[in-house]
């Protein structure tokens, strides 16, 4: 699957394709207990636990699809990952390595451009701007390169229209987005289902927050399927989540 995607990139068919995978594991934990331990050992800004017709979903997402607050649009693309170091010195060395990795930086710049383009399709003219570009944000198990992209939502454009323009997130699809999604549909062995969807809230005043449904597990008959992130990175942050989830199971 990965090699086929690389050939698509080499041929110029697409610049980037973000492939996904499903890891099926057995566990004695219930979904709520899993969520509680995940929150303790691998906290993220957007954590969730909720029932669906397919099973209970629990997860720890670091990333937004989109937030609109008082008509300000906000997207924070994440691309570029390293594991956390054993101490502050190791963390600093890994951060320097991450910020000097041309592959990671090129991927991140591409996603900034994609976010600017997506927001620009429905934002007020000349309102799209990038702030705090290429900063490293540290989480419990990993560190990521993160940038912030803003725009102003004009009157007459609803949050639903805005989300429809941005969805799915570029970090879960690729660039150009439509062609990347076609390739994903061709190459991935399973339909994504809820993976890569949105989880969040809508307010009556028009504010909205939708996080990306990644780094999550769906519990079916008390078992778990781990919906992981991009397969193209050698230092895949999924492995860090899988490791964190393994720590949950070892405590059971």
Regions found by a protein language model. Give the residues of each.
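Extended alpha-helical targeting/anchoring segments
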Residues: 1-252
